[in-house]
């Protein structure tokens, strides 16, 4: 695919892997990321083979027919790259190697998932719907030999499934369980971060309860599997109507508090340190001229669409592209003077004076071409002096998932807990993991230098787990 798009070897795989390790503070396993980076393309090709009706686009917003969009398309993200963006010159790069399935379906990529499921069923796979895993089974040698499930749609009867080769856990994350979150990611609970899993925003199960409850984590831990330390909450901020585009940010005291040109996860971290976990994004009437100089990162605007461009293309919409007119109402506050704007935001007294002084200082730095206060790239420093002025209030973001499962490796193995009697940390025979219950992929923070990386590792290691389980690797 990347060869088709002219992106073959555009990023060295070790550059990507090393960046991912840094963003996770080296508490994850490089071997997992390296194997994925070297071979993910092979599994992606296999994955889409199941759906021959897929239309592969050459650019992010290539014109397609409604029929093509209804059946499903695959697009390269941020391609072609913005004229003024080169990831190699960025402190926080977003690598141009991501792609996205799109369709008229609510679940977007559901068509290719269903195609692979149907292929498995045709090959003899048996499915059990509405069932909950409750317990893993082991033999006297410690090998996992099966699982007990509860069939919620048939009188809650329990069924024992015996495994000739092994058991693969693909049970998702644990963000919907507050007890697990308090232990492994307490800052999410302490900061009262909105939890999409616990709130049922990611769907509910057949009993009407929220999902992402850590069932696989529990089942593994109950038989002695080591749970990964330092879970990684996926709390990357997506901003407001203007996304996370790096315009000026002030806290409630009127102070500028960061280099705004950082990714959404780092933005969230900084906002959580501010009074009331609140900030204001400010920009002026010339924002449309400034957007093309902004980074092509996750959640930010960096392309301006001509006003006369036809919008009938089903593949027209993309988060990084906008017409200026499309953002005419994408603000919370608007005024012809900065003082009036800040007053609307709630600033008064000393905080108002501080905010005005902060903007004056920012304007001086922008004109001088050097951010001596926070080190923001000069090419993204734009003085606020063109009315009308706009502002959006930000709070904390929502957590999509909390990534951190059973400790694993590049072969999807699981390992025993630390034990002075067995310091070598034995592999648990017959138990494999993939998806968000596979630990050691990320740690501390979810990295966003490559968009969609969670899905990519889920697909890749789902394939590896299946192959290795059958082969007894």
What are these regions (language model features)?
Residues 1-55, 59:
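Redox-cofactor-proximal catalytic regions of oxidoreductases
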Residues 36-157, 178-179, 366-386:
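Conserved redox-cofactor binding core of oxidoreductases
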Residues 159, 297, 307-311, 404-473:
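C-terminal structured subdomain/cap of oxidoreductase catalytic cores
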Residues 150, 163-164, 169-171, 252, ...:
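Short, well-ordered coil/turn residues at beta-beta hairpins
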Residues 135, 348-445:
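A glycine-rich dinucleotide-binding beta-alpha-beta segment and adjacent secondary-structure elements
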Residues 154-157, 162-237, 449-451, 455-464, ...:
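Glycine-rich loop(s) and the adjacent beta-strand/alpha-helix scaffold that form part
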Residues 213, 217, 223-347:
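An anion/pyrophosphate-binding glycine-rich loop and adjacent beta-alpha core
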Residues 27-32, 50-64, 226-230, 258-259, ...:
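A short alpha-helix-loop-beta-strand transition element characteristic
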